[in-house]
């Protein structure tokens, strides 16, 4: 009875066998495809660098555009203020004509608008003469029309763009260095002599014999 129980237990403990099968094509591709995968990784890295470079350039263009619009708006405001000052400071001219039977008389009245005297701008009256007043008015009209200074570029963006371009140039230089030795070897080979036919060789040998005789 004990022996039968042991036999039954041994039969129950058996497990199904595992069979491992290898795909020869995939195995060969894995063993021989190291160079191929390396080239693919390089291509992917170059494409990623190009995409990052495009994004940085796009950001830089947008920032420049925003700065240009801001500077243009400030300049337009300054020009509008200068036009208003010119309109207030300009001279007021009136002319009246009187017709007579023998001649015509024209009476012209010119009156300058003194902003400092009327305290329209809140300025104190100047102590000097008319020459000083005209110089001050000219300087006040010229100051708002000066060109505004440009803002400096973002140094972080320029550094990123320069680093990305340097990495791209390094990849291109490696490719050029690998291609040059083959050209040098091809250039060192001596030129091959042109092939001649049997009839040409016979003619040449016949001429040599006649010249020897």
UniProtKB/Swiss-Prot annotation:
Biased composition (Basic residues): 170-182, 198-213
Residue span of region Disordered: 118-213
Primary location class: nucleus
Top-rank taxon, per record: Eukaryota
UniProt keyword list: Coiled coil, Cytoplasm, Nucleus, RNA-binding, rRNA-binding
Keyword Amino-acid biosynthesis: no
Phenotype upon changing residue 21 to A: Loss of DNA damage response pathway activation
Single GO molecular function: RNA binding
GO CC annotation terms, alphabetical: cytoplasm; nucleolus
Residues forming coiled coils: 33-96
Subcellular location: Nucleus, Nucleolus; Nucleus; Cytoplasm
InterPro entries: Nucleolar_protein_12
Family (UniProt): Belongs to the RRP17 family.
Known partners and oligomeric status: Interacts with KIAA1191.
Function field: Multifunctional RNA binding protein that plays a role in RNA metabolism and DNA maintenance. Participates in the resolution of DNA stress and the maintenance of genome integrity by localizing to sites of DNA insults. Also plays a role in proper nucleolar organization by limiting nucleolar size and regulating nucleolar number. Mechanistically, regulates the nucleolar levels of fibrillarin and nucleolin, two key players in pre-rRNA processing and ribosome assembly.
Name of this protein: Nucleolar protein 12
Source organism of this protein record: Homo sapiens (Human)
Lineage: Eukaryota, Metazoa, Chordata, Craniata, Vertebrata
Gene name, Swiss-Prot/TrEMBL: NOL12
């Amino acid at each position: 009875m004990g022996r039968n129980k042991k036999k039954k237990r041994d039969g129950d403990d058996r497990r199904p066998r595992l069979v491992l099968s290898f795909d020869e094509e995939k195995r060969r591709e894995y063993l021989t495809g190291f160079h191929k995968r390396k080239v693919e990784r390089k291509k992917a890295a170059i494409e990623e660098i190009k995409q990052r470079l495009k994004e940085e350039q796009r950001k830089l263009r947008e920032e420049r555009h925003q700065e240009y619009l801001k500077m243009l708006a400030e300049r337009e405001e300054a020009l509008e203020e200068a036009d208003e000052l010119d309109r207030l400071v300009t001279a007021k001219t009136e002319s009246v004509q009187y017709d007579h039977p023998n001649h015509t008389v024209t009476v012209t009245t010119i009156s300058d608008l003194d902003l400092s005297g009327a305290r329209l701008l809140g300025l104190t009256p100047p102590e000097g003469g008319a020459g000083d007043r005209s110089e001050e008015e000219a300087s006040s009209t010229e100051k708002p029309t000066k060109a505004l200074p440009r803002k400096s570029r973002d140094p972080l963006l320029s550094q990123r763009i320069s680093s990305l371009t340097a990495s791209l140039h390094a990849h291109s230089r490696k490719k050029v260095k690998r291609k040059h030795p083959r050209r040098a070897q091809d250039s060192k080979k001596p030129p091959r002599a042109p092939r001649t036919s049997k009839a040409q060789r016979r003619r040449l040998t016949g001429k040599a014999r006649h010249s020897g005789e």
